[in-house]
Amino acid sequence: MKWIEVNTYDEMSEVAANIFLKQIQKKPNSVLGLATGGSPVGMYKELVARYQAGQLTFKDVQTFNLDEYVGLKRSSPASYWTFMHNNLFNGVNIKQENIHLPNGEAEDLAAECKAYDARIDAAGGIDLQLLGIGVNGHIGFNEPGTPFDSMTNIVELTESTRTENAIYFDDAADVPIHAITMGIQSIMKAKEIVLIAFGEKKMEAIQKLKSGHITEDFPASQLLKHPNVTIIYGGTN
């Protein structure tokens, strides 16, 4: 596991964007695993700027997002589908058919979970996976207690996670109770993983990860077993 400490959010975003830039330049048809929330916004802005500067192309890139809310329409301003288009996809030349997010509106959610993992496998697996980390150590929407061998599944969100995400909704009560998320084992199958975290609230989780204790009570700790993980973090002051 490689640790990179940064001084600012912008520096974190630039360092992470550089890793993704090099991946796409090395393999133009890369399969990328993407995340949502506040942590990756700056990195996506960097990637759009570098695309506009002619440094990379998304023409043959495929993307798979970690998660989506259950029961929220894709057209909703708070959906991760909308988030990804507003922050990245609308600013680059990615093909719509190469964009994949779990379908939280599927009639058969269990079948959608299996189909999502199958789509990732059919694409050749994820080359580079981006992660954030929750204050309780969740990755994707894999909350404490999630089995390490979990694949894409339906989860009930904890109160702390719903509170974290309430800023994206008009009312905290509007935050969905359930989500569809890539499981911890789904994430661990990625060839390379980059986790980004910045700010005082995230640092307690980073310190727990640094402790080296692996437990299902702290989902991100399973990353310690992955052979190719980079942690980009800062904001302790």
UniProtKB/Swiss-Prot annotation:
Enzyme nomenclature, EC number: 3.5.99.6
Q: Where is the active site?
A: 67, 136, 138, 143
Q: Which InterPro entries match?
A: Glc/Gal-6P_isomerase, Glucosamine6P_isomerase, Glucosamine6P_isomerase_CS, NagB/RpiA_transferase-like
This protein's GO cellular component annotations are:
cytoplasm
Q: What pathway annotation does it carry?
A: Amino-sugar metabolism; N-acetylneuraminate degradation; D-fructose 6-phosphate from N-acetylneuraminate: step 5/5
**What keywords tag this UniProt record?**
Carbohydrate metabolism, Hydrolase
Q: Which reaction does it catalyse?
A: alpha-D-glucosamine 6-phosphate + H2O = beta-D-fructose 6-phosphate + NH4(+)
Instruction: List, alphabetically, the Pfam families matched.
Output: Glucosamine_iso
Q: Output one GO BP term.
A: N-acetylneuraminate catabolic process
* Top-level EC class as recorded in UniProt: hydrolase
- Signal sequence range: none
Answer whether the UniProt record assigns the keyword DNA repair to this protein.
no
GO MF, one term, reads: identical protein binding
Homology family: Belongs to the glucosamine/galactosamine-6-phosphate isomerase family. NagB subfamily.
Task: Explain the purpose of this protein.
Answer: Catalyzes the reversible isomerization-deamination of glucosamine 6-phosphate (GlcN6P) to form fructose 6-phosphate (Fru6P) and ammonium ion.
Q: What is this protein called?
A: Glucosamine-6-phosphate deaminase
